[in-house]
């Protein structure tokens, strides 16, 4: 999404090709917004559908629009990741499907998300609960709702009042994953907090990917204190407290 926002005018019109439809039809069970060959849709609408509901047909259409193919887009993603400091990330498939060579980690994903959240339009999209794609030449309007339950207003159990993004995802190998960001509650003084959850196992009773995210965010806002502006001895004292609280956090999550 960040590449599309940086490379394209959001109002540019993309015409969906036959090859995009063929690619998505070959991926059974993949999330999509059911694009059709010849459909004309804006870059912005494609980005919203990627971010809110993980629409892979939208990804395929954007990748082809920007650089001609998914393979070329994966190369572009790799170059972008390295350029912003994600040194331990290797991208081989633009759509995230498993290959033995493709990998990343929580630290690199945090670097990537921090960079993305400096883009105003990206922040707006990441924090969006509901979005309607206007009718196109091939389809009527489409109503989307964010699958990130920290944002989703239809889910009271996991909704986080100050959450402002970012992206949830799932594959059979990776399990449930979430990159999330939240502002401090009104009663707290602090900064925006970013958390990465990888490989969460969900059950019918509990979506642990969101439970863990809420646990991390609450713990951070309740225990974090900025050290800037304090004397060195105060900073050392606060650092010792931080080490202690991190240990407690590990106990909570284990």
What are the functions of these language-model segments?
Residues 1-107, 116-120:
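Active-site-adjacent loops and short helices of periplasmic peptidoglycan-processing enzymes
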Residues 86-87, 98-103, 107-108, 113-254:
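Domain-terminus/edge residues, biased toward the C-terminal soluble/receptor-binding domains
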């Amino acid at each position: 999404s960040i590449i599309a926002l940086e490379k394209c005018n959001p109002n540019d019109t993309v015409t969906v090709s036959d090859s995009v439809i063929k690619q998505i039809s070959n991926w059974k069970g993949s999330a999509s917004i059911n694009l059709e060959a010849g459909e004309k849709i804006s870059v912005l609408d494609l980005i919203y559908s990627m971010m809110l509901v993980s629409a892979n047909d939208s990804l395929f259409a954007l990748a082809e629009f920007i650089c001609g193919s998914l393979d070329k887009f994966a190369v572009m993603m790799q170059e972008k990741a390295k350029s912003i400091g994600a040194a331990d990330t290797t991208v081989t498939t633009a759509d995230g499907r498993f290959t033995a060579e493709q990998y990343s980690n929580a630290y690199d994903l945090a670097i990537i998300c921090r960079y993305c959240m400096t883009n105003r339009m990206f922040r707006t999209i990441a924090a969006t609960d509901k979005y309607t794609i206007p009718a196109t030449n091939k389809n009527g309007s489409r109503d989307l709702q964010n699958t990130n339950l920290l944002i989703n207003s239809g889910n009271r159990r996991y909704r986080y009042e100050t959450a402002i993004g970012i992206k949830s995802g799932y594959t059979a190998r990776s399990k449930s994953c979430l990159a999330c960001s939240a502002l401090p509650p009104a009663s707290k003084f602090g900064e925006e907090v970013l958390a990465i959850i990888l490989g969460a196992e969900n059950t019918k009773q509990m979506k642990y990917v969101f439970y863990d995210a809420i646990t991390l965010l609450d713990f951070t806002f309740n225990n974090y204190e900025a050290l800037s502006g304090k004397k060195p001895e105060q900073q050392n004292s606060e650092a010792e407290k931080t080490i202690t609280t991190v240990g407690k956090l590990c106990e909570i999550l284990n």
